[in-house]
Amino acid sequence: MTDRVSVGNLRIARVLYDFVNNEALPGTDIDPDSFWAGVDKVVADLTPQNQALLNARDELQAQIDKWHRRRVIEPIDMDAYRQFLTEIGYLLPEPDDFTITTSGVDAEITTTAGPQLVVPVLNARFALNAANARWGSLYDALYGTDVIPETDGAEKGPTYNKVRGDKVIAYARKFLDDSVPLSSGSFGDATGFTVQDGQLVVALPDKSTGLANPGQFAGYTGAAESPTSVLLINHGLHIEILIDPESQVGTTDRAGVKDVILESAITTIMDFEDSVAAVDAADKVLGYRNWLGLNKGDLAAAVDKDGTAFLRVLNRDRNYTAPGGGQFTLPGRSLMFVRNVGHLMTNDAIVDTDGSEVFEGIMDALFTGLIAIHGLKASDVNGPLINSRTGSIYIVKPKMHGPAEVAFTCELFSRVEDVLGLPQNTMKIGIMDEERRTTVNLKACIKAAADRVVFINTGFLDRTGDEIHTSMEAGPMVRKGTMKSQPWILAYEDHNVDAGLAAGFSGRAQVGKGMWTMTELMADMVETKIAQPRAGASTAWVPSPTAATLHALHYHQVDVAAVQQGLAGKRRATIEQLLTIPLAKELAWAPDEIREEVDNNCQSILGYVVRWVDQGVGCSKVPDIHDVALMEDRATLRISSQLLANWLRHGVITSADVRASLERMAPLVDRQNAGDVAYRPMAPNFDDSIAFLAAQELILSGAQQPNGYTEPILHRRRREFKARAAEKPAPSDRAGDDAAR
């Protein structure tokens, strides 16, 4: 039984109430009684609106399902389909042209293009790593990944391999030549660096030279005649050459260079949503407490690395000498967003007088907004660090369907600002373009938040899940691997960029693109993810600090501002392309192809769900059926479960096929997790495993889940597991894993 405190019409879990009163409110100048009265009023006023929006989702889906069932096997008449979607209010009139008016936004969002990390906030170590990933070692990122092949004697090994190190150095020198070229010669031939008359002087074997563009010299540390680092800038991103002739690497370098540091994760999303498993008050408070520590600057995590124990804390800002003299400071940490949950879920952290749980999205806005106040100014109580230098709070809002839901979020933020005594529009919104009704009405969605919006982002993983569920009754969908080449998804990516630029995002807000999920395949990422900035994205998601440093290379190669200028005024996608349903043209799959698809998806589902339900791990590096590590979260789970639910609905497979595949894949997943002491095998007692049953339920009842979301089943099953574990002691739980080291 949860211990609760009554406040007005609400009953608040004691653990949350005490955290807010004793930890979150001190330092904000907000009276506790006034705050809780405001919470009570916001919940009372906005809960009916929230529920009405969910009802509208269900009503629209029911009408779409009915339309497709009536169509039977006839080809889709696109004109009739578009007219139908317009008549039911799914497809709305496009508003007149406009420009967003959001003000008070940090430069990391408005003008600096670069990588964006997403990290589970329930794991303090990962959150700290992500916040500190503003700056990353290029040498480490190259040496430790497959970007440098382990051939010709360049294996990693347990100790430093000079052959590999030399290849790293050569790669980095080539990067410098390409990004901040010298007026003559190459960084590869440099023998020293000095600063003379405010200019960088680079010594070569036979002469001295400088930068081809002297304006790319941004500063230095140490003495001008013998600097310990040289700071350069390209496309708004900083590059720092560290010089230490006595270091292990520096002793092998003619110029004494020991590393090249790149400005990497410019922004980071601290996530309360898809990458976490927060199902009750205790889980929510863990996340809120970590968010508080990040904003106050006092979050710390004990780390044991190679037998050495230390305390990880937030990095301080970085101090430099300007080329012409005088000191300046650069941020030492990534600018933080916080991702709240969407409109669907409730949480028992607060219940009303009837015992009904309060909508979690309303709670998140109130409590993450309150906590973020500590990141707006430094003080003895708030700590020495600040997040936003312009006084803004940045909240990513996911899984919104259409402009009415965006408008509701803006109203919620406005009401929260009143409760917190903040100026209107302090709380900015990042709009995830990851639901089909938002995509086809994106211009209207942006207009609904024109004075708050700071980013739009194509979440293609969730977006694919909604694409499948929306048209569940239309027929069997193409295989998961084929989905990325479908007309709708190509149009979707272009449409997002074009809509953002048309609304004036360039120089005002981020245009973002999705995650690289193959966490170990960094060479492939370096080869292919450059397509995102080339497409006009000013940021794109990466799964780790190392990936952020490597993806930063792309923003030196691509001038995103120039790309956006070239795309301005274009409209590359049509509504017909966006509405093209990814149906299989014919059921031409051989039985072994069907079995392969089912096994691949069942293995992926089991590999993710077993850690979610049994260990509370919301974001995992899950080996696929071929043992390739993939970053999995609820978005990838949504795709896999919805595709199989669709095939089940249309007779491509049977429930017996699903069960047989799950039973085949469970032992494989058990073997892949054999090294985890907290892991509980699913085989051979499948029906005794709550995780196995959750995976099965996600598929068999996938067609009936609201918009295909996995949260209702996951939350219920995780609570079931927690209740069972409370009755019978089990191995220790964990709040995160290795998704973002």
UniProtKB/Swiss-Prot annotation:
Ways its activity is controlled: By bromopyruvate, oxalate, and phosphoenolpyruvate. Malate inhibits the activity to 50% at 1 mM concentration. Glycolate inhibits only at fairly high concentrations.
MF term (GO), any: protein homodimerization activity
Keyword match Transferase: yes
Keywords: Cytoplasm, Glyoxylate bypass, Magnesium, Metal-binding, Oxidation, Transferase, Tricarboxylic acid cycle
Modification Cysteine sulfenic acid (-SOH) occurs at: 619
Residues engaged in binding Mg(2+): 434, 462
Co-factor note (free text): Mg(2+). Mn(2+) is able to replace Mg(2+).
Subcellular location: Cytoplasm
Similarity field: Belongs to the malate synthase family. GlcB subfamily.
UniProt cross-references to NCBIfam families, sorted A to Z: malate_syn_G, PRK02999.1
Subunit structure: Homodimer.
Designated name of the protein: Malate synthase G
Species assigned in the record: Mycobacterium tuberculosis (strain ATCC 25618 / H37Rv)
Taxonomy of the source species: Bacteria, Bacillati, Actinomycetota, Actinomycetes, Mycobacteriales
